[in-house]
Amino acid sequence: MKKLFLIIGAPGSGKTTDAEIIAKNNPDSINHYSTGELLRAEVASGSERGKIIEGFTSKGNLVPLEIVVETIVSAIKNAPKNVVLIDGYPRSTEQMEALDKILKEESDVELTNVIEVEVSEQVACDRVLGRARGADDNAEVFRNRMSVYLAPLKPIQAFYTAKGILHKINGERTIEEIVSEMEGFIKSRL
């Protein structure tokens, strides 16, 4: 049985870095993937699904939700280790519902927890912009990414809270402190 942990958080929350470090600290037991990496790996594999994905990405189009979710679930099932961390998913209620639907049919994958790395908008902005004050376009891009993240956040939180699997972590600390807490939490759930 594969245990899946989804790690969500604002741009600049450190979710990818946290997950990478935890996987590196536990090479025998934990895999980490990002959705983009999984799609690129599927294309590189030359599989039928990879060819379909490339048909969309090569034209700059979004990959249909169903294909994204199938790719994620396939990667989880084929992961060499039993614990899988995926960061940056779900990004929408549609992605959340699609994954939930597929996981209901899967007996060998369990969504163990969704970990939300919480940071204020100001901290996230400072991290993303590297404290380089001024460049409005960068701040503008950040604000857009932030609003895209925040728009579906409440229903996503409510959905996973109702399932009793949402776990929030304060992301406004050192990487060491955050990783230590997150890693300890993940291990406590195995």
From Swiss-Prot:
Q: What does this protein do?
A: Catalyzes the reversible transfer of the terminal phosphate group between ATP and AMP. Plays an important role in cellular energy homeostasis and in adenine nucleotide metabolism.
Assembly mode: Monomer.
- Upper classification of the organism: Bacteria, Pseudomonadati, Campylobacterota, Epsilonproteobacteria, Campylobacterales
Reaction(s) catalyzed by this protein?
AMP + ATP = 2 ADP
> Coiled coil where?
none
- SUPFAM superfamilies assigned to the protein according to its UniProt record, in alphabetical order: P-loop containing nucleoside triphosphate hydrolases (SSF52540)
Q: Which gene encodes it?
A: adk
Which biological process, per GO, is one annotated for this protein? AMP salvage
Disulfide pairings: none
What is said about the domains?
Consists of three domains, a large central CORE domain and two small peripheral domains, NMPbind and LID, which undergo movements during catalysis. The LID domain closes over the site of phosphoryl transfer upon ATP binding. Assembling and dissambling the active center during each catalytic cycle provides an effective means to prevent ATP hydrolysis.
Listed GO MF terms: adenylate kinase activity; ATP binding
- What family is this? Belongs to the adenylate kinase family.
Question: Which domain of life, per UniProt?
Answer: Bacteria
Q: Where is this region: LID?
A: 130-136
- Location of the region described as NMP in the Swiss-Prot/TrEMBL record: 34-63
Q: Which Pfam families match?
A: ADK (PF00406)
**UniProt KW keywords:** ATP-binding, Cytoplasm, Kinase, Nucleotide biosynthesis, Nucleotide-binding, Transferase
List positions binding ATP.
Answer: G12, S13, G14, K15, T16, T17, R131, R173
Entry's EC annotation: 2.7.4.3
- Residues the record lists as binding AMP: T35, R40, N61, L62, V63, G88, Y89, P90, R91, Q95, R133, R145
Q: Which PROSITE patterns match?
A: ADENYLATE_KINASE (PS00113)
The cellular component terms of Gene Ontology attached to this UniProt record, alphabetical and capped at eight, are: cytoplasm
Q: In which pathway does it act?
A: Purine metabolism; AMP biosynthesis via salvage pathway; AMP from ADP: step 1/1
Q: Where in the cell is it found?
A: Cytoplasm
UniProt name for this protein: Adenylate kinase
